[in-house]
Amino acid sequence: MKTLEKVSDFVGKYMAAIVIVVAAGALFFPGPFSVVKTSWVNTLLGIVMFGMGLTLKPNDFKVVFSRPKDVIVGCVAQFTLMPFLAWMLTMVFHLPTELAIGVILVGTCPGGTSSNVMTYLSKGDVALSVGMTAVSTVLAPVLTPLLTLLYAGQRVDVNPVNMFLSIVKVVLVPIALGFVVNHFFHEFTQQAVRVLPLVSTTAIVLIICAVVSANSAKIMTSGLLILVVVVLHNLLGYLTGYAVGKALKLDTTKCRAISIEVGMQNSGLATSLAAAHFAQYPLATIPGAVFSVWHNISGAVLANFYARTADKQ
């Protein structure tokens, strides 16, 4: 068990580097990585979400009732800024339909699971970050399909009901199961969560393997455009999230949490939805996969920057 914990700690610490290496391998040498199929994406995402559920406790939801304003501000920013920024970038860069769908899906998804760790590293308000992630994830089955319909409905047929059912199945059900297991078998989960970074990172890496290796040729021809759009989307999310907090005169720790929570998305869910509901557009899965790689890099850099500025204050 101790060996697994050490491996898990290593993987958690160097997740960004591991993701980059694997993504590059799947891009330039897709053959060996193509053993991981895109049909596995939903199952792999479910594993990540189950792991998230194992870490949730009733106390994590207290911030919703003790500081509703902060959570509301953060979640409203999450579901207004990122979808709009995604749509705006698809228009500015005249993205083809299949790429535009993928970018919009990233924008309409809830906060990413690694945002809580980045907020902790940034010396931000961790309780607010956890609360925002939990609430935005619970709201996702309703808001993600509706926002996707709003921003992508002019380009493609969007079935909000089917998307709702998909999100419930691959996100809410695994989280709820993890939460229940943690509640009734707390001593077991205390041991299990020690190797959670290893399990979650492995699942995320496999999702990236599946998507990148299956679309390597197309990524090679349009990869730079996708990367530019994804980077801008992510960075603008950080910037506007922080700006909203400052405009509403929230303290710096809250601004950091909102900034990171808004900028980091559950891009695995975006990839899952693209594969399940827009299979006729294979490239729609790519923005989510690229975002998964990029936001772990940018999140770590931003967290380090925020932490340094906090030390100087």
Predicted regions and their residues:
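Alpha-helical transmembrane segments of multi-pass small-molecule/ion transporters
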Residues: 1-313
